[in-house]
Amino acid sequence: MSVFLGYIIFLAAFFGLATGLFLGLKAIKLI
């Protein structure tokens, strides 16, 4: 259960980081 919870947190953090990086690159291209 603890490992499963840690995996979900890791996945959410990784997805959030990837999304932020993608949006940042799109913003740079627009400028």
UniProtKB/Swiss-Prot annotation:
One BP term from GO: photosynthesis
InterPro entries, per the entry: Cyt_b6/f_cplx_su6
Major place of residence: plastid
Pfam family, one: PetL
Membrane topology, record value: Single-pass membrane protein
Domain of life, per lineage: Eukaryota
Record GO terms (molecular function): electron transporter, transferring electrons within cytochrome b6/f complex of photosystem II activity
SUPFAM superfamilies: PetL subunit of the cytochrome b6f complex
Keywords: Chloroplast, Electron transport, Membrane, Photosynthesis, Plastid, Thylakoid, Transmembrane, Transmembrane helix, Transport
Transmembrane segments: 3-23
GO cellular component, one term: chloroplast thylakoid membrane
Subcellular compartments: Plastid, Chloroplast thylakoid membrane
UniProt keyword Phosphoprotein present: no
Family: Belongs to the PetL family.
Main function: Component of the cytochrome b6-f complex, which mediates electron transfer between photosystem II (PSII) and photosystem I (PSI), cyclic electron flow around PSI, and state transitions. PetL is important for photoautotrophic growth as well as for electron transfer efficiency and stability of the cytochrome b6-f complex.
Assembly: The 4 large subunits of the cytochrome b6-f complex are cytochrome b6, subunit IV (17 kDa polypeptide, PetD), cytochrome f and the Rieske protein, while the 4 small subunits are PetG, PetL, PetM and PetN. The complex functions as a dimer.
Name by which UniProt lists this protein: Cytochrome b6-f complex subunit 6
Organism of this sequence: Pyropia yezoensis
